[in-house]
Amino acid sequence: MDKASALTALRAHQAELKQLGVEHLFLFGSTARGVARDDSDVDFFFDHPLGSIGLLELIDVKAATSRVFGHPVDVMTRRSLHPILREAIESSAVQVF
């Protein structure tokens, strides 16, 4: 999926994702860079209110974004980004909402 299509699809589901606790959603990785292949997964990280997300809520966000694309996604919170990779990921990320 190309970057523009991914952004459009995600923005169409903004209300649903916000109900799941997603305050801000960011696209990163090959889709954000415009180099995704047909077999590429789609990578996201998101911000949420502190203390409001647990494993089950994270699974719900992953399931919701996976339904948007119909194939695998990687979803994580901003706080869970690896410290060594965080700066590179954040600098290349595209804010969805």
Model-derived segments and their meaning:
Residues 1-24, 33-38, 50-97:
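Catalytic core of pol beta-like nucleotidyltransferases
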Residues 28, 45-47:
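Short hydrophobic/aromatic beta-strand micro-patches
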